């Protein structure tokens, strides 16, 4: 029975998911496949990651960021080390992220250690950004109190007017979210949504199909 009309899901359902029954040996391969498919399906913001961090006493915060890239070890993103998420990552070293693609009815959960990148990698991230993005990232101290909005705007405008790449602020850093657990979720019209979980097992991965 098709019960999708009772759901709040507004995108496609029953997208192809052959890996559900024949999963790759590790999850990054599947993540890359899904991202490539999302591009073809014209998902509007495939890199919008809802990233949750926490303090050492368990107080959770979350925000949506755009991750930078994916390599064979995980998902790379950047932030200010002095921001709330930066401070919480320093406290615990762990984070959990969720990609939700309304257009295709898919979700990907990524949970694991957020490992700081080397300074050379931070530089590569910074100088890989378009020059106009440097101004506000240099002028702002992310998550600090905003005392004078116009002063910050003016400072960023002065930097932008220079028209050159700016030095990377030391507080601008990158992390790699290296998964210890990942889950791939695909909506189904019969509500038997397909959930495939990967769990780190030493140097290998264990896969499990989960009930919806």
Curated annotation (Swiss-Prot):
Its EC number is 1.10.3.16. Disulfide bonds: none annotated. It holds the Pfam family PNPOx_N. Substrate binds at residues 8, 80, 129, 137. It catalyses: (1R,6R)-1,4,5,5a,6,9-hexahydrophenazine-1,6-dicarboxylate + O2 = (1R,10aS)-1,4,10,10a-tetrahydrophenazine-1,6-dicarboxylate + H2O2; (1R,10aS)-1,4,10,10a-tetrahydrophenazine-1,6-dicarboxylate + O2 = (5aS)-5,5a-dihydrophenazine-1,6-dicarboxylate + H2O2; (1R,10aS)-1,4,10,10a-tetrahydrophenazine-1-carboxylate + O2 = (10aS)-10,10a-dihydrophenazine-1-carboxylate + H2O2; (1R)-1,4,5,10-tetrahydrophenazine-1-carboxylate + O2 = (10aS)-10,10a-dihydrophenazine-1-carboxylate + H2O2. SUPFAM superfamilies: FMN-binding split barrel (SSF50475). Signal peptide: none annotated. InterPro entries: Phenazine_biosynth_oxidase, Pyridox_Oxase, Pyridox_Oxase_N, Pyridoxamine_oxidase_dimer_C, Split_barrel_FMN-bd. Its cofactor is FMN. GO terms for biological process: phenazine biosynthetic process; pyridoxine biosynthetic process. Binds 1 FMN per subunit. GO terms for molecular function: FMN binding; pyridoxamine phosphate oxidase activity. Involved in the biosynthesis of the antibiotic phenazine, a nitrogen-containing heterocyclic molecule having important roles in virulence, competition and biological control. Catalyzes several oxidations in the terminal steps of core phenazine biosynthesis. It oxidizes both hexahydrophenazine-1,6-dicarboxylic acid (HHPDC) and tetrahydrophenazine-1-carboxylic acid (THPCA) and thereby contributes to the generation of both phenazine-1,6-dicarboxylic acid (PDC) and phenazine-1-carboxylic acid (PCA). It synthesizes phenazines in their reduced form, which are the likely end products in vivo. This is Dihydrophenazinedicarboxylate synthase. It comes from Burkholderia lata (strain ATCC 17760 / DSM 23089 / LMG 22485 / NCIMB 9086 / R18194 / 383). The gene is phzG.
């Amino acid at each position: 029975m098709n019960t999708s009309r009772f759901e709040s899901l507004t995108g496609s359902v029953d997208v192809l998911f052959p890996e559900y029954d024949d999963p790759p040996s590790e999850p990054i391969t599947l993540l890359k496949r899904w991202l490539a498919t999302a591009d073809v399906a014209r998902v509007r913001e495939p890199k919008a990651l809802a990233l949750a961090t926490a303090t050492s006493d368990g107080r959770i915060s979350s925000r949506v960021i755009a991750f930078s890239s994916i390599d064979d070890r995980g998902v790379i993103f950047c932030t200010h080390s002095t921001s709330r998420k930066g401070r919480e990552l320093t406290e615990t070293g762990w984070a959990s992220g969720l990609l939700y693609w309304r257009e295709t009815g898919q979700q990907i959960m990524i949970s694991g250690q957020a490992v700081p990148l080397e300074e050379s990698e931070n530089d590569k991230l910074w100088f890989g950004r378009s020059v106009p993005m440097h101004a506000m990232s240099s002028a702002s101290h992310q998550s600090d109190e905003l005392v004078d909005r116009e002063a910050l705007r003016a400072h960023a405008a002065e930097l932008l007017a220079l028209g050159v790449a700016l030095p990377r602020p030391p507080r601008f850093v990158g992390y790699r979210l290296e998964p210890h657990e990942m889950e791939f979720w695909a909506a189904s019209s019969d509500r038997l949504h397909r959930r495939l979980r990967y769990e780190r097992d030493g140097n290998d991965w264990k896969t499990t199909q989960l009930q919806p």
